[in-house]
Curated annotation (Swiss-Prot):
This is Sulfur carrier protein FdhD. HAMAP family: FdhD. It comes from Chromobacterium violaceum (strain ATCC 12472 / DSM 30191 / JCM 1249 / CCUG 213 / NBRC 12614 / NCIMB 9131 / NCTC 9757 / MK). Residues 1-10, 20-30 have a biased composition (Basic and acidic residues). The keyword Plastid does not apply. The lineage of its organism: Bacteria, Pseudomonadati, Pseudomonadota, Betaproteobacteria, Neisseriales.
Amino acid sequence: MSMQDHDRTEQGMTSLAVTRHLDGSSRPDWDRVAEETPVALVFNGISHAVMMATPLDLEWLAVGFALSEGIVARRAEIFDIESDFVCGGAEVRLEIAQPAFLALKDRRRSLAGRTGCGVCGIESLAMLDLSPEPIAGPAGPVSADPAAIARAAAELPAHQRLMQATGCAHAAAWCGRDGGVRMAFEDVGRHNALDKLIGWLALEGMDPADGFVFMSSRASYELARKCARTGIPLLATISAPTSLAVDIARRAGVALASFCRRTGFVEYTA
């Protein structure tokens, strides 16, 4: 299995010539803009999804997508992964266990237009999975610890290099139970950032029950569903949740905290 270097200081963005207007005057300048490119995910030689993503950490993205979308149930079902930049985009090829591949073919997903959001690309509402199984997480109920949330909120900005440079990226951070940020991934799509993090957890052999996810975005349905499917016990977000995200989190036993700041947060499930 090949893995790209995890050096992202100047990747994921490009510099463009712009005209900057301020206080009635104009001047030529340069601006850094986040990159967005089509990424095709290919399973056992068959293209399954094409999504728009920041071209960073794509092998983590593919593994996380496979797990969070239920294509594979565990890391051991992924045998090999390779990635290349081709035809103006990127292609990530995964070799997965045959039973998982046969089940994937039966799901009748669209071969193009997927966004990674868990809804786009399905063929009917009947195929939409809104009934998650309870997560196999900690034995007791999980709730958001105020000190841990405050620490995560304080530490996250230092891990948002792409956002600071471009103003155009979401971050998904893995935090220890004490709230310390252990790793963070950025992408123009919040669901992509989370999939990259989920892929990293799987490839590093991390236990999802040993920490929580802290995100710079709102809490949407697909984020709650991805956390539920991969056994993450707590999702904390800076912005608001949707009603469906709250419902999914409650059904799955995922603790959900939003409007997370250093000074407080709102707990929607526990």
